[in-house]
């Protein structure tokens, strides 16, 4: 019996610079946590997954969160099936930017593509050094309940948390993302992706 071809899906990860996007993808695809921060311009990975008995080839697109790459980033949205919108648990500003920047960009470029809100660096809530740093900056970690409310308000499929450092929740994020991507038909996606190719 011939093996059927895997279903191909494209996942794009967006969010502020240094919020943990590249680490998340590295841990999921390569199995290691990068120890040095190097700003991403564009990185692509491919992962073969099995979800609900279906073989899925997931193309993973990492994007730059920094402002200097804003003219390039829209290209990465073309033909996306699912978007992960990331923020760092230790950066309330990065969650604020989800509502004020990232969702606006997604709704403009890919209005029909589902997205999941992902709180990254969840391990820092119990890290003594991080706790002290947040106290020194007079800031609080983002609470799960806060992020849940944001997810509901912006129309995210769901809210999830993970830690790339410990690996907690990483596989769950990609399993949920793959499931959501499988609900998108390519014909719908092609209509919305025409907007994704416009560069001004």
From Swiss-Prot:
Keywords, in A-Z order: Cell membrane, GTP-binding, Lipoprotein, Membrane, Methylation, Nucleotide-binding, Prenylation
Transmembrane helix is among the record's keywords: no
Question: Its GO CC terms?
Answer: cell division site; cytosol; new growing cell tip; nucleus; old growing cell tip; plasma membrane
Task: Quote the PROSITE patterns the UniProt record gives.
Answer: RHO
- Motif Effector region covers 37-45
Predominant subcellular localization, coarse grouping:
membrane
Read off the InterPro entries from this record. P-loop_NTPase, Small_GTP-bd, Small_GTPase, Small_GTPase_Rho
Which Gene3D superfamilies did the record assign?
A: P-loop containing nucleotide triphosphate hydrolases (3.40.50.300)
Q: Which residues bind GTP?
A: 15-22, 62-66, 120-123
Q: Name one GO molecular function term.
A: protein kinase binding
Propeptide residues, chain positions: 198-200
CDD domains named in the record? Rho2
Its membrane topology, per UniProt?
Lipid-anchor
Q: Could you list the residues that carry lipid attachment of the S-geranylgeranyl cysteine kind.
A: 197
- For the modification Cysteine methyl ester, the affected residues are 197
GO process terms (BP):
actin filament organization; establishment or maintenance of actin cytoskeleton polarity; negative regulation of glucose mediated signaling pathway; positive regulation of cell integrity MAPK cascade; regulation of actin cytoskeleton organization; regulation of fungal-type cell wall (1->3)-alpha-glucan biosynthetic process; signal transduction; small GTPase-mediated signal transduction
The UniProt function text for this chain reads: Involved in cell morphogenesis, the maintenance of growth direction, control of polarity and of cell wall integrity. Regulates the synthesis of alpha-D-glucan through activation of pck2.
| Subunit | Interacts with pck2.
Q: Which family does it belong to?
A: Belongs to the small GTPase superfamily. Rho family.
Please state what the protein is called. GTP-binding protein rho2
Supply the source organism for this entry.
Answer: Schizosaccharomyces pombe (strain 972 / ATCC 24843)
The gene name on file is rho2
């Amino acid at each position: 019996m011939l093996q059927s071809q895997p279903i191909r899906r494209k996942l794009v990860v967006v969010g502020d610079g240094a919020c943990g996007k590249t680490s998340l993808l590295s841990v999921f695809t390569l199995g290691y946590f990068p120890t040095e921060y190097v700003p991403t311009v564009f990185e692509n990975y491919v992962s073969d997954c099995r979800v609900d008995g279906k073989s899925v080839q997931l193309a993973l697109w990492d994007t730059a969160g920094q402002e200097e790459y804003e003219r390039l980033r829209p290209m990465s949205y073309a033909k996306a099936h699912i978007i992960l919108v990331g923020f760092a648990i230790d950066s309330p500003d990065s969650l604020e930017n989800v509502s004020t920047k990232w969702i606006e960009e997604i709704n403009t470029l890919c209005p029909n593509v589902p997205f999941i809100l992902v709180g990254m660096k969840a391990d820092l809530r119990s890290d003594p050094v991080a706790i002290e740093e947040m106290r020194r900056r007079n800031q609080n970690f983002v609470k799960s309940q806060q992020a849940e409310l944001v997810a509901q308000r912006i129309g995210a499929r769901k809210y999830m948390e993970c830690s790339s450092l410990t690996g907690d929740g990483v596989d769950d994020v990609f399993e949920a993302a793959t499931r959501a991507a499988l609900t998108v038909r390519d014909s719908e996606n092609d209509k919305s992706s025409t907007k994704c190719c416009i560069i001004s």
